[in-house]
Each structure stands twice: as structure tokens, then as C-alpha cells.
Amino acid sequence: DTYLKTLPPLRSKSDQKSLWDGLMDGTIDIIASDHNPMDIESKRCEFGKAEFGTATIENSFGWYRAKKANQRALDRWVEAVAHNPRKLFNLKDCSIDIGNYADLTIFANDGSLIEKKTLGANVPNWNQNGRAIGIINNKKIIQL
């Protein structure tokens, strides 16, 4: 299945469990994604000829929620994808306050919302529980 051709490659169940354990016990500080959406032609071909990649930014939260939905796991996930990368790169903390410009991602909790801009984003048989639907940054609202 060319939708599953990613780099780095998808890992075994044992590796996935180790990653979750590392996130929960603090061994893993930061989670990043290689957001690399592909067009139809790049994925509708033989596996060996298919390009590596899939859209991950708007899907990663839904994939996460389909697997781990408790509050502690959510707090650790948000810390690893949002707060800790900002600390690493010495970026200021974001806060929602009167007079501040918003800098945030908007998520929808309802189902998989499978409207996609590329076929690479539509990875078959991966359950989702919501996804990012937009961002607010620099006084602009961007719908995904």
C-alpha cells in the first residue's frame, strides 16, 4: 500500500509501544512530524516507484486521540508537540490574553473529517478521532 510508504518507515507495534512509554515517562521530550503530502500521481503507482510521504500535520492529533484519550496522555502530547519545541528554539510562550495576538491551532473532535487536499493524507485503515481544521497566526485565520 503506497499510502504507507513513509520516511522514516512505520514501526512495529513493539516500537510504537516503546515510543508511547517514552513519551509518558518523560524520556521523549519532543515529537515532530515529517509533513510531506504527496499528490495523486506520486502515490497511485507501484510501491517501489511511489514517493515517500504523507500529510501529517492536520492528522497527527486525530491519530493520537484514536490511541490515547486520557488527560495525562493529552497533556504530555501537547507538551511534546507544542511547548517543548518552543523552549528548544528559545521562542516565547504563547498565551491567550486580551490584547495579545492569537497563535494557535483549531481542532475538531468529531470523527475523522476525511476531507483532504492530497491523497497522501488519506491513509487507509488509520482510525482518527478529530483533526486540525485551522490555525490562527499573525492576525490571519487559515483553514486546513
Model-derived regions, located:
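Histidine/acidic residue-rich metal-binding segments in metalloenzymes
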Residues: 1-31
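Short capping/connector residues at structural and topological boundaries
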Residues: 9-11, 15, 52, 119, ...
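A generic local structural motif
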Residues: 15-19, 92-93, 122
